[in-house]
Regions:
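A detector of repeated loop/turn-to-beta-strand junctions in beta-rich toroidal repeat architectures
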Residues: 45, 261, 311-314, 389-391
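Extracytoplasmic electron-transfer domains, predominantly the class I c-type cytochrome c fold
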Residues: 33, 38, 42-149, 155, ...
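Blade/loop signatures of beta-propeller domains
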Residues: 149-183, 331-338
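Short coil/turn segments that connect the beta-strands within blades of beta-propeller domains
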Residues: 152-153, 203-205, 252-253, 297-299, ...
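Conserved beta-propeller blade signature
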Residues: 205-209, 215, 255-257, 301-303, ...
Length: 430
């Protein structure tokens, strides 16, 4: 009897508390089941206590009312405009279980100007600030003031340059001082033991990845600035399930990345805020992704993995602003299409030809180059007699339309799993 009375008392007190705090009631009804009762993350949703300070009230209201689409967050149109301020107040009151939320400060810079914004991280002589201009500012102490720092040269893609040379024009390291190189800082990944990331640098910030995770670091100190992370995909098979991810591409204020389950996402490079999320292919059909995208003009271009699991490979191009697919080039033909005569037997139904390595681009020729992996199954070709176009090939595509210009096949009818997966390095010869 006492237990029943006590339980009833708790329910009454809780109901009374919610009645006095409509924001808490809204959070409990619509947010807590995914993001946890304290907003620090749950089984179905990420930690939002760290993300709320990075958005304005208007941005928060838009996210709540419209959702985040393919990212998995539904829209909540039933929350009225009159109720929204109470919910936003509750969101702004969320506390981290560990660490502290970003602190707002106004700083005097060495040139006498001021900078106001959120301090995302700091050391004794350094600050990483998300300014009110919504841009990242890296600062170093000069007496009682601060000076801005940035990178001497950016490396904004997997290969550094669109033509794939991976050549750096920096001259700070040379024959005379190379023997004196020593570690400057160390950053430890805690979420992955299969690192394949290429660090990308933009405006003094280094971006590194593991599966479904991007971390922004102060390139001068290695201090973490922000982290975007989403849960690994349960039930995924193939290379994407190993945790491999080769990095990001940056253009302007946007950062582009592939997820393990073959989604292309765009983030704000200053705050890590998700801008859009587009499904390239259905992971339930064994598609996955491990590569780094390539930016060409107003498009961001990438391929997928999954050939060893029987998928049909393709290269896709997506609008940088919206994530809308603009074109798709399939690496193997369907029955009856040109090239299908090089597939004799039932193997054309599960042809492989994955496109997981990053391509290159020749601006003078306005041509995109991409490489294609092995046919499937790898070692047995009895069900796929013929050359098996366009597997084990390099293809030249029109970057605006995806139309094939030409191809060269390195290994017709590959039964050795040779692939042709490498970055095409473009050179001018005499």
């Amino acid at each position: 009897m006492l237990k029943q009375v006590f339980t009833g008392l708790v329910i009454v007190l809780a109901s009374s508390s919610y009645a006095q705090d409509p924001g808490q009631q809204l959070f409990t009804d619509h947010c807590a089941s995914c993001h946890g009762t304290d907003g620090n993350g749950g089984e179905l949703g990420p930690n939002i206590a760290t993300r709320v300070p990075l958005r304005s009230d208007a941005e928060l209201a838009t996210v709540v009312s419209q959702g985040l689409g393919a990212a998995g967050m539904p829209a909540f149109p039933a929350i009225s405009a009159n109720e929204m301020p109470a919910l936003i107040t509750k969101l702004r009151a969320l506390k981290l279980r560990f660490g502290s939320a970003p602190e707002r400060r106004e700083l005097v810079l060495a040139d006498g100007s001021t900078l106001a914004g959120l301090v995302l991280n700091q050391g004794n002589d350094e600050l990483q600030v998300l300014g009110d201009d919504r841009r990242l500012h890296l600062l170093r102490r000069v007496d009682q003031r601060w000076r801005a720092v940035t990178s001497q040269n950016d490396w904004t893609s997997y290969n550094g340059e669109l033509h794939g040379s991976r050549h750096s024009a920096l001259t700070g390291i040379n024959k005379q001082n190379v023997t004196a190189l020593a570690p400057a800082w160390l950053f430890n990944f805690t979420s992955n033991n299969n690192l394949q990331t290429t660090p990308v640098v933009s405006e003094g910030v280094m971006y590194v990845t593991s599966a479904n995770e991007v971390i922004a670091l102060d390139a001068g100190s290695g201090r973490e600035i922000w982290r975007y992370q989403r849960a690994r995909t349960r039930g995924l098979i193939g290379n994407g399930a190993t945790g491999a991810n080769r990095g990001v591409a940056i253009n302007g204020d946007r950062l582009f990345m592939l997820t393990d389950h073959a989604h292309m996402i765009a983030l704000d490079k200053h705050s890590g805020t998700l801008l859009w999320d587009t499904e390239m292919a259905d992971w339930r059909l064994n598609y996955n992704a491990t590569g780094a995208p390539l930016v060409v003009g107003n498009l961001v271009i990438a391929g997928t993995s999954g050939g060893d699991e029987g998928v049909r490979g393709f290269v896709g191009a997506y609008d940088q602003s919206s994530g809308r697919e603009v074109w798709r080039w399939w690496s193997t033909p369907l029955p009856g299409e040109p090239g299908s005569e090089t597939w004799q037997g039932p193997g054309i139904a599960h042809p492989a030809g994955s496109t997981w390595m990053t391509g290159t681009y020749d601006k003078a020729l306005d041509t995109l180059y991409w490489t294609v992996g092995n046919p499937g199954p790898d070692m047995i070709g009895d069900d796929r007699l013929g050359d098996n176009l366009y597997t084990d090939s390099v293809v030249a595509l029109d970057p605006a339309t995806g139309k094939l210009k030409w191809h060269f096949q390195f290994t017709p009818h590959d039964v050795w799993d040779y692939d042709a997966q490498e970055t095409p390095a473009l050179v001018d010869t005499m």
